[in-house]
A protein has these predicted regions:
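ATP-dependent adenylation/pyrophosphate-handling site
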Residues: 2-47
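Metal-dependent de-N-acetylase/amidase catalytic core
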Residues: 1-4, 27, 43-50, 61-62, ...
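A generic signature of intrinsically disordered, low-complexity regions enriched in glycine/proline
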Residues: 15-16, 31-33, 58-59, 117, ...
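Short glycine-rich catalytic loops that host catalytic nucleophiles or stabilize transition states
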Residues: 36, 70-74
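Alpha-helical scaffolding within the catalytic cores
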Residues: 18-20, 53-57
Length: 205
Protein backbone atom coordinates (compact mmCIF):
# COMPACT_ATOMS: atom_id res chain seq x y z
CA UNK A 1 0.00 0.00 0.00
CA UNK A 2 1.03 3.58 -0.63
CA UNK A 3 -0.01 6.40 1.69
CA UNK A 4 0.19 10.17 1.15
CA UNK A 5 -0.28 12.45 4.16
CA UNK A 6 -1.20 16.00 3.07
CA UNK A 7 -0.78 18.65 5.77
CA UNK A 8 -0.53 22.39 6.17
CA UNK A 9 2.56 22.63 8.38
CA UNK A 10 5.58 20.65 9.59
CA UNK A 11 4.63 18.53 12.64
CA UNK A 12 0.95 18.26 11.55
CA UNK A 13 1.73 14.93 9.88
CA UNK A 14 3.23 13.52 13.07
CA UNK A 15 0.55 14.96 15.37
CA UNK A 16 -2.19 13.58 13.18
CA UNK A 17 -0.90 10.25 11.91
CA UNK A 18 2.58 9.67 13.34
CA UNK A 19 1.86 6.31 14.97
CA UNK A 20 0.10 4.99 11.86
CA UNK A 21 2.87 6.27 9.61
CA UNK A 22 5.44 4.47 11.74
CA UNK A 23 3.44 1.22 11.64
CA UNK A 24 2.85 1.34 7.88
CA UNK A 25 6.46 2.14 7.06
CA UNK A 26 7.74 -0.64 9.32
CA UNK A 27 5.30 -3.06 7.69
CA UNK A 28 6.87 -2.31 4.31
CA UNK A 29 4.27 0.14 3.00
CA UNK A 30 5.29 3.40 1.33
CA UNK A 31 4.52 6.59 3.24
CA UNK A 32 4.98 10.00 1.61
CA UNK A 33 4.22 13.41 3.12
CA UNK A 34 3.11 16.61 1.38
CA UNK A 35 3.62 19.77 3.47
CA UNK A 36 2.03 22.91 2.05
CA UNK A 37 3.92 25.46 4.17
CA UNK A 38 7.41 24.62 5.40
CA UNK A 39 7.98 27.81 7.40
CA UNK A 40 6.69 28.83 10.83
CA UNK A 41 6.85 32.62 10.88
CA UNK A 42 3.59 32.97 12.79
CA UNK A 43 4.64 30.75 15.70
CA UNK A 44 5.38 32.47 19.00
CA UNK A 45 8.50 30.42 19.73
CA UNK A 46 9.51 29.60 16.20
CA UNK A 47 12.72 27.82 15.27
CA UNK A 48 14.85 29.18 12.47
CA UNK A 49 13.85 27.95 9.01
CA UNK A 50 16.90 25.69 8.73
CA UNK A 51 16.19 24.28 12.20
CA UNK A 52 12.58 23.52 11.29
CA UNK A 53 13.69 21.84 8.06
CA UNK A 54 16.17 19.72 10.03
CA UNK A 55 13.49 18.79 12.57
CA UNK A 56 11.07 17.84 9.79
CA UNK A 57 13.61 15.63 8.07
CA UNK A 58 14.80 13.94 11.27
CA UNK A 59 11.28 13.26 12.56
CA UNK A 60 9.98 11.93 9.26
CA UNK A 61 13.08 9.80 8.69
CA UNK A 62 12.55 8.24 12.11
CA UNK A 63 8.94 7.43 11.19
CA UNK A 64 10.11 5.80 7.95
CA UNK A 65 8.78 8.37 5.48
CA UNK A 66 9.87 7.75 1.90
CA UNK A 67 9.61 11.29 0.50
CA UNK A 68 8.51 14.77 1.58
CA UNK A 69 6.93 17.18 -0.92
CA UNK A 70 7.67 20.68 0.40
CA UNK A 71 5.51 23.66 -0.51
CA UNK A 72 6.30 27.33 0.09
CA UNK A 73 2.81 28.70 0.66
CA UNK A 74 2.53 31.44 3.34
CA UNK A 75 2.04 30.38 6.95
CA UNK A 76 -1.43 31.25 8.35
CA UNK A 77 -2.10 33.09 5.09
CA UNK A 78 -2.96 30.22 2.78
CA UNK A 79 -6.41 31.79 2.33
CA UNK A 80 -4.63 34.53 0.33
CA UNK A 81 -3.38 31.99 -2.23
CA UNK A 82 -5.56 31.17 -5.26
CA UNK A 83 -7.29 27.87 -4.54
CA UNK A 84 -6.15 26.43 -7.87
CA UNK A 85 -2.48 26.80 -6.92
CA UNK A 86 -3.02 24.78 -3.75
CA UNK A 87 -4.89 22.11 -5.70
CA UNK A 88 -2.23 21.88 -8.40
CA UNK A 89 0.57 21.48 -5.85
CA UNK A 90 -1.24 18.56 -4.23
CA UNK A 91 -2.08 17.09 -7.65
CA UNK A 92 1.62 17.10 -8.55
CA UNK A 93 2.39 15.16 -5.36
CA UNK A 94 -0.41 12.70 -6.13
CA UNK A 95 0.87 12.09 -9.66
CA UNK A 96 4.37 11.31 -8.44
CA UNK A 97 3.49 9.49 -5.23
CA UNK A 98 0.68 7.35 -6.72
CA UNK A 99 -1.00 6.75 -3.34
CA UNK A 100 -3.73 4.25 -2.59
CA UNK A 101 -4.80 6.24 0.47
CA UNK A 102 -4.66 10.00 1.07
CA UNK A 103 -5.02 11.46 4.57
CA UNK A 104 -5.45 15.14 5.40
CA UNK A 105 -6.92 17.60 7.90
CA UNK A 106 -10.58 17.62 8.83
CA UNK A 107 -12.18 20.76 7.32
CA UNK A 108 -13.64 21.81 10.70
CA UNK A 109 -10.18 22.30 12.26
CA UNK A 110 -9.82 25.70 13.93
CA UNK A 111 -6.62 26.49 12.00
CA UNK A 112 -7.51 28.17 8.70
CA UNK A 113 -4.48 26.72 6.91
CA UNK A 114 -5.82 23.28 7.79
CA UNK A 115 -9.15 24.20 6.21
CA UNK A 116 -7.50 25.47 3.02
CA UNK A 117 -5.38 22.33 2.78
CA UNK A 118 -8.37 20.06 3.36
CA UNK A 119 -10.52 21.78 0.74
CA UNK A 120 -7.72 21.74 -1.83
CA UNK A 121 -7.04 18.08 -1.12
CA UNK A 122 -10.71 17.21 -1.60
CA UNK A 123 -10.52 18.61 -5.10
CA UNK A 124 -7.09 17.20 -5.92
CA UNK A 125 -8.10 13.59 -5.23
CA UNK A 126 -10.47 13.79 -8.21
CA UNK A 127 -7.54 14.19 -10.59
CA UNK A 128 -7.89 10.64 -11.95
CA UNK A 129 -11.34 11.52 -13.32
CA UNK A 130 -9.81 14.16 -15.58
CA UNK A 131 -6.52 12.37 -16.23
CA UNK A 132 -7.09 8.65 -16.89
CA UNK A 133 -3.35 7.97 -16.76
CA UNK A 134 -3.25 9.04 -13.09
CA UNK A 135 -3.65 6.25 -10.56
CA UNK A 136 -7.06 6.19 -8.87
CA UNK A 137 -7.09 6.99 -5.14
CA UNK A 138 -8.83 4.15 -3.31
CA UNK A 139 -9.52 5.84 0.03
CA UNK A 140 -9.59 9.38 1.44
CA UNK A 141 -9.35 9.90 5.21
CA UNK A 142 -9.44 12.80 7.63
CA UNK A 143 -7.25 12.78 10.73
CA UNK A 144 -7.33 14.46 14.12
CA UNK A 145 -4.60 16.98 14.93
CA UNK A 146 -4.48 17.60 18.70
CA UNK A 147 -5.15 21.24 19.72
CA UNK A 148 -6.91 21.99 16.41
CA UNK A 149 -9.53 19.32 15.70
CA UNK A 150 -11.07 18.85 19.15
CA UNK A 151 -12.28 22.45 19.56
CA UNK A 152 -15.40 21.86 17.41
CA UNK A 153 -16.29 25.57 17.46
CA UNK A 154 -17.79 25.95 13.99
CA UNK A 155 -21.27 24.46 14.29
CA UNK A 156 -21.88 25.18 10.62
CA UNK A 157 -19.53 22.29 9.82
CA UNK A 158 -19.93 18.69 10.89
CA UNK A 159 -17.35 18.01 13.58
CA UNK A 160 -14.72 15.29 13.34
CA UNK A 161 -16.34 11.93 14.11
CA UNK A 162 -13.84 9.12 13.43
CA UNK A 163 -15.09 5.85 11.98
CA UNK A 164 -11.74 4.34 10.97
CA UNK A 165 -9.00 3.37 13.41
CA UNK A 166 -5.51 1.93 12.97
CA UNK A 167 -4.25 -0.40 15.72
CA UNK A 168 -0.75 0.85 16.45
CA UNK A 169 -0.06 -0.54 19.93
CA UNK A 170 2.14 1.00 22.60
CA UNK A 171 5.17 0.79 20.35
CA UNK A 172 3.47 2.94 17.71
CA UNK A 173 2.32 5.55 20.23
CA UNK A 174 5.80 5.71 21.74
CA UNK A 175 7.25 6.18 18.26
CA UNK A 176 4.82 9.05 17.60
CA UNK A 177 5.78 10.80 20.83
CA UNK A 178 9.48 10.34 20.10
CA UNK A 179 9.02 11.74 16.58
CA UNK A 180 7.14 14.74 17.98
CA UNK A 181 9.95 15.39 20.46
CA UNK A 182 12.27 15.80 17.48
CA UNK A 183 10.37 18.98 16.59
CA UNK A 184 11.63 21.85 18.72
CA UNK A 185 8.94 23.58 20.79
CA UNK A 186 6.00 21.34 19.82
CA UNK A 187 5.44 19.27 22.95
CA UNK A 188 3.79 20.83 26.01
CA UNK A 189 3.13 19.70 29.60
CA UNK A 190 -0.16 17.97 30.41
CA UNK A 191 -3.09 18.80 30.13
CA UNK A 192 -2.16 20.47 26.84
CA UNK A 193 -3.37 18.39 23.84
CA UNK A 194 0.21 18.24 22.59
CA UNK A 195 1.53 16.54 25.70
CA UNK A 196 2.73 12.94 25.88
CA UNK A 197 0.02 11.99 28.40
CA UNK A 198 -2.78 13.49 26.28
CA UNK A 199 -1.57 11.83 23.08
CA UNK A 200 -1.25 8.48 24.86
CA UNK A 201 -4.76 8.82 26.27
CA UNK A 202 -6.21 9.84 22.91
CA UNK A 203 -4.74 6.73 21.29
CA UNK A 204 -6.43 4.56 23.93
CA UNK A 205 -9.91 5.96 23.32
Amino acid sequence: MKYLIVVAHPDDETLGAGASMWKWAHNGDTVDVCIMCTEAKARAFRPEDNELEDDTNVSNKFLGVNKIYEGTFPNIEMNTVPHLKLVQFIEAAIKESEPDVIITHHPADTNNDHLQTSMACQEAIRLFQRRPEVKRVKEFWYMEVPSCTEWKINNAMESFNPNCYVEVGKEGVDAKIKALSMYRGVMRPYPHPRSADYITGLAAM
